[in-house]
Amino acid sequence: KYIEENIKKGFNVYQSKPNTSEKFVSPTIIEINKLSNLSEEQFGPILHVIKFKSSEVSTLISDINNSGYGLTMGIHTRIESRADLFSQQCNIGNIYINRDMVGAVVGSQPFGGRGLSGSGCKAGGPNYLMQFLDEKVVSKNSVAFGGNAELLNIQEEK
């Protein structure tokens, strides 16, 4: 249904083969002209492509961050500084630069979205277990003015 709607809207849609089953979605590329054409996240083999001019980069980054979503984004460019700009300024959980957009390695690469796409790292990565911790700071002045150092160092008998 989603793919058919985009065809009706006049977007270029490319599929590996026609979809003949309601239970299967063929890998699909949908070329859209602006980010606001996306109204919800799509899960499945659907890739949205946006072509943009250099003069539109800051607007596109702003649109990405204001969309509310941020699971995965792919950037394909020969301009290293542009890839760096997108990766630094876009609030996205997983950013793939000049490569395929699959293959987060559970256990070593954090994987999770931002905003409406999730709440950060869900699997893998060195900080994964940190989400299960409840930090507490206790600060005690053990040498308060007038304190007796000998009394402060008495050990309890076992």
What function would you assign to each model-found segment?
Residues 3, 8, 19-158:
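Conserved C-terminal structural/oligomerization subdomain of aldehyde/semialdehyde dehydrogenase
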Residues 13-17:
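Diglycine-centered glycine-rich loop/turn motifs
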